[in-house]
């Protein structure tokens, strides 16, 4: 409430004080005017907003292509990543012996925060499991290497995902090739002709052979 001030001229003046807010703590209470009050006290509802800047779609595609090139090069030249994909390579074994790992696709989020790397692994089940597990274990290492190779304000988080589409496609192609080969071999086989039977029929004596017909 405003305070009432009396003067000698019998005029009244109202002294207005800004509303005072009190915040209690474990030790003492703090008093401050409304302009200095926390946001959650000045408004009934405190709203937390997260602002994300979306990059240009063209730039997103360019970043995805560059990441795909860098990762493909790392699979060929980086020994740390090669040994993670195929541990036998560290012992001197052929790194193409049990599995072959390739980067099939790369997707970058619109805010350039996350990159999904789709990996195709050709080989037996054990080789696939080892390769995918090795790549996932080196996700932070790959992110740091990408930060060194690429000029980005923020290096995106790397997530490796197994891509089974190419393997399924190769299986379908193999099945179609097998069917085509079987069909071609079936058409190449000639059916036994009846020419030999016809020859045998001609060799049989004709009962009317010795009969002379007179007109």
Swiss-Prot record:
Compositional bias annotation for Basic and acidic residues: 183-192
Family annotation (Gene3D superfamilies): 3.30.300.20
Compositional bias (Acidic residues): 194-210
Record region (Disordered): 183-210
Keywords noted in UniProt: Chloroplast, Plastid, rRNA processing, Transit peptide
Superkingdom of source: Eukaryota
GO terms of biological process kind: ribosome biogenesis; rRNA processing
Organelle targeting sequence: 1-52
Pfam family name, one: RBFA
InterPro entries in alphabetical order: KH_dom-like_a/b (IPR015946), RbfA (IPR000238), RbfA_dom_sf (IPR023799), Ribosome-bd_factorA_CS (IPR020053)
Subcellular localization, as worded in the UniProt entry: Plastid, Chloroplast
Gene Ontology CC terms: chloroplast
Main localization category: plastid
Family: Belongs to the RbfA family.
Protein name: Probable ribosome-binding factor A, chloroplastic
Naturally occurring in which organism (per UniProt): Arabidopsis thaliana
